[in-house]
Amino acid sequence: MADIPENAPQHCPGTGSTEAGKSSACQGCPNQSICASAATSAPDPAIEEIKEKMSLVKHKILVLSGKGGVGKSTFSAHLAHGLAQDEGKEVALLDVDICGPSIPRMMGLEGEQVHQSGSGWSPVYVEDNLAVMSVGFLLSSPDDAVIWRGPKKNGMIKQFLRDVDWGEVDYLIVDTPPGTSDEHLSVVQYLSAAGIDGAVIVTTPQEVSLQDVRKEINFCRKVKLPIIGVVENMSGFICPKCENESQIFPPTTGGAEKMCTDLNVSLLGKVPLDPNIGKSCDTGKSFFTEIPDSPATLSYRIIIQRIQDYCEKKK
């Protein structure tokens, strides 16, 4: 991401962006004509630095959602836990939801802090093979609000990707904010040179969520971000007593399955509602070890295996 002029509007795409001087945010900016002429455009040196840092990371997976509250961060946390159950795999979880960092609590790491070493920022470890980094570790209190404009968020993401000392990692999972914002553009721009395996998009069955997922899919295609597949979360409730399934959020337009068929995207699986998932997130424990035989756990295992198979085929 290139520099942002001091007198730039709030949603300035950056002087080195392909949208510089052309996006709707540039209207009325005193720098518009200069940026549009490409006179300020220059490669961001951080891109090469990040590429070198990421050369130690085999697979990079972005977790996206069109709408907040569909369980994206919950999925990211459990994807990390599930991959890390293989003790031979090194797993890293990066939280770039700058204004709503929930990963520290979900991973049982609230109150932890980041330490500086000679080789960069040291991530916080949940297990010997599971490392986490989040802006939540930089706040004095979990209740502190992060009130930053786009350029400052982009700078934080750049620092995470360039300066965190992950070491050699098999899987880097990047938990992003909902929607398509500056954070998504920054991550894609910085990681493209290093190679992103793809994105997993999380949704719920109802149309109000699916309509935003369609936009997310279009975003991925426009920025040439491969789509690993879609996960339908909160997909029915299986009674633990009678094992009958009820549709708490009815898929009025066919749910994620029909959407994936229409848009030629893979459906990785459906995760049923389970109150214990929310409980495990609140207590910072792994759902896989707490309720290993629940229908939700079994669904997660199938989805995680499909993600691994996709990544291995891309090697």
Swiss-Prot record:
Biological processes, Gene Ontology terms: iron-sulfur cluster assembly
Cell location: Cytoplasm
Cellular component, GO, one term: cytosol
InterPro entries: Mrp-like_CS (IPR000808), Mrp/NBP35_ATP-bd (IPR019591), NUBP1/Nbp35 (IPR028601), P-loop_NTPase (IPR027417), YlxH/NBP35 (IPR033756)
Cofactor mode of binding and number, as noted: Binds 4 [4Fe-4S] clusters per heterotetramer. Contains two stable clusters in the N-termini of nubp1 and two labile, bridging clusters between subunits of the nubp1-nubp2 heterotetramer.
CDD domains, sorted: Mrp_NBP35
Record-listed [4Fe-4S] cluster 1 binding positions: 12, 26, 29, 35
Entry keyword set: 4Fe-4S, ATP-binding, Cytoplasm, Iron, Iron-sulfur, Metal-binding, Nucleotide-binding
PROSITE patterns: MRP
GO molecular function: 4 iron, 4 sulfur cluster binding; ATP binding; ATP-dependent FeS chaperone activity; iron-sulfur cluster binding; metal ion binding
Primary localization class, coarse: cytoplasm
Residues holding [4Fe-4S] cluster 2: 239, 242
Cofactor: [4Fe-4S] cluster
Annotated ATP binding sites: 66-73
Quaternary context: Heterotetramer of 2 nubp1 and 2 nubp2 chains.
PANTHER family named in the record: CYTOSOLIC FE-S CLUSTER ASSEMBLY FACTOR NUBP1, NUCLEOTIDE-BINDING PROTEIN NBP35 YEAST -RELATED
Biological function: Component of the cytosolic iron-sulfur (Fe/S) protein assembly (CIA) machinery. Required for maturation of extramitochondrial Fe-S proteins. The nubp1-nubp2 heterotetramer forms a Fe-S scaffold complex, mediating the de novo assembly of an Fe-S cluster and its transfer to target apoproteins.
Family: Belongs to the Mrp/NBP35 ATP-binding proteins family. NUBP1/NBP35 subfamily.
Name this polypeptide is given: Cytosolic Fe-S cluster assembly factor nubp1-B
Lineage: Eukaryota, Metazoa, Chordata, Craniata, Vertebrata
